Amino acid sequence: MVFRRFVEVGRVAYVSFGPHAGKLVAIVDVIDQNRALVDGPCTQVRRQAMPFKCMQLTDFILKFPHSARQKYVRKAWEKADINAKWAATRWAKKIEAREKKAKMTDFDRYKVMKARKMRNRLIKIEVKKLQKAALLKASPKKALAAKGAAAVAAAAAAKVPAKKITTEGKKAPAQKAPAQKAAGQKAAPPPKTQKGQKAPSQKAPAPKASGKKA
């Protein structure tokens, strides 16, 4: 980037240290390579010689003649609205934030910490929502799987023991008890025995007594 902040008549500078630190001045004349004649009619800085070491040049330039009187400098300053333009720059905002931070108490720093934590929590929640929406939009298969997992989680949270839900989100088929054989159906044949093994002997039922005991 080309350097454009040159020492010239009308250049507005920021005083970084010294008795007038934090104020803006305009260069009225250059005395030598180390000092300049400055004036700050709108910042309560009287016309005086000031070294370049304590000045930082800004991007603002006023149009007034060489070694102009204070009323011409004031008129050019107010016409260019230097104070409002300076307050809107990032440079001025950083200086103001630094001063506010230096004046903060322990309780103020605690409130700032809590506010930052709350802000970060809200940002994380919104980011997760956006990521989930993008995932569902990109792959419909993963969307169906996510819905099935959500259904399983909801069923587990509800704690319904009667209804068993599989991982696919469907009910498990109920097992029916074997029905009893009808009276007219024949019994199944006994299993075949291998050679060398005896067939299990079936005992005949005992005959019922015709007469009752005394």
UniProtKB/Swiss-Prot annotation:
| SUPFAM superfamilies hit by this protein | Translation proteins SH3-like domain
Keywords (A to Z) from UniProt: Acetylation, Cytoplasm, Isopeptide bond, Phosphoprotein, Repeat, Ribonucleoprotein, Ribosomal protein, Ubl conjugation
Question: What GO terms in the biological process aspect are recorded for it?
Answer: ribosomal large subunit biogenesis; translation
Q: Which residues carry this modification: Phosphoserine?
A: S139
GO CC, any one term = cytosolic large ribosomal subunit
Specify residue ranges for compositional bias: Low complexity: 172-214
Where N6-succinyllysine occurs, residue numbers? K85, K203
Positions annotated as sequence repeat: 170-174, 175-179, 180-184, 185-189, 192-194, 195-197
Residues folding into a coiled coil are none
Using the UniProt annotation, give all residue ranges assigned to the region (2 X 3 AA tandem repeats of K-G-Q).
192-197
What InterPro entries does the entry give? Rib_uL2_dom2, Ribosomal_eL14, Ribosomal_eL14_dom, Translation_prot_SH3-like_sf
Q: Does the keyword Ubl conjugation apply?
A: yes
Sites bearing N6-acetyllysine, chain numbering: K79, K85
Name of the protein in its database record? Large ribosomal subunit protein eL14
